[in-house]
């Protein structure tokens, strides 16, 4: 079912669940004028097709004490170092996202820390000690005015 094409009902279901993943199928069924069974079948088909990959709860890092967010561009010593560098970065709790990119940086990561001092510790004692990394550039996040996912 890899080439499942979504229709307007699927789009509506996705938008509703992206807004609140805990919305009951019965409520969605009423909203779209179909049976709860239809909603269930559609959701299962989208799961099998890899369109729906899970449900999650969003938390506020700031409310949990993470006051410093940053993006770090990483230049590797060699392209062949990517798998091992990525494995080491993945082991760091402060690294919340990683991207393999084109352009100046080989890897771009998002890091969350409780303070500037904590960020400095992560940079000096964790990230910059990874042998495969040649250099880094850190961009501190001042605001996150737009945060959304794609529309189905």
From Swiss-Prot:
Phosphoprotein listed as a keyword: no
A molecular-function term among this protein's GO annotations: DNA-binding transcription factor activity
Gene3D superfamilies assigned: 3.30.70.920, Winged helix-like DNA-binding domain superfamily/Winged helix DNA-binding domain (1.10.10.10)
PROSITE patterns linked to this entry: HTH_ASNC_1, HTH_ASNC_2
InterPro entries in UniProt: ArsR-like_HTH (IPR011991), AsnC-type_HTH_dom (IPR000485), Dimeric_a/b-barrel (IPR011008), Tscrpt_reg_AsnC-like (IPR019888), Tscrpt_reg_AsnC/Lrp_C (IPR019887), Tscrpt_reg_HTH_AsnC-type_CS (IPR019885), WH-like_DNA-bd_sf (IPR036388), WH_DNA-bd_sf (IPR036390)
DNA-binding region: 25-44
One annotated GO biological process: response to amino acid
HTH asnC-type domain ranges (all copies): 6-67
Keywords: Activator, DNA-binding, Transcription, Transcription regulation
Keyword Metal-binding listed: no
NCBIfam families: PRK11179.1
Function: Activator of asnA transcription; autogenous regulator of its own transcription; and repressor of the expression of gidA at a post-transcriptional level.
Protein name, UniProt field: Regulatory protein AsnC
The organism of origin for this protein: Escherichia coli (strain K12)
Taxon lineage: Bacteria, Pseudomonadati, Pseudomonadota, Gammaproteobacteria, Enterobacterales
């Amino acid at each position: 079912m890899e080439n499942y094409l979504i229709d307007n009902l699927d789009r509506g279901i996705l938008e509703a669940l992206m807004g609140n993943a805990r919305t009951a199928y019965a409520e969605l069924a009423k909203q779209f004028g179909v049976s709860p069974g239809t909603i269930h079948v559609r959701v299962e088909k989208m799961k099998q097709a890899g369109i729906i990959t899970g449900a999650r709860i969003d938390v506020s890092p700031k409310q949990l004490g993470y006051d410093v967010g940053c993006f770090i561009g990483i230049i590797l010593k060699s392209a062949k170092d990517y798998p091992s560098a990525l494995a080491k970065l993945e082991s760091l709790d402060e690294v919340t996202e990683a991207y393999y990119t084109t352009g100046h940086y080989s890897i771009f990561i998002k890091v969350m820390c409780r303070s500037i001092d904590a960020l400095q510790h992560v940079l000096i004692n964790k990230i910059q000690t990874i042998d495969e990394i040649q250099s880094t550039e850190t961009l501190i996040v001042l605001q996150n005015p737009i945060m959304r996912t794609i529309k189905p």
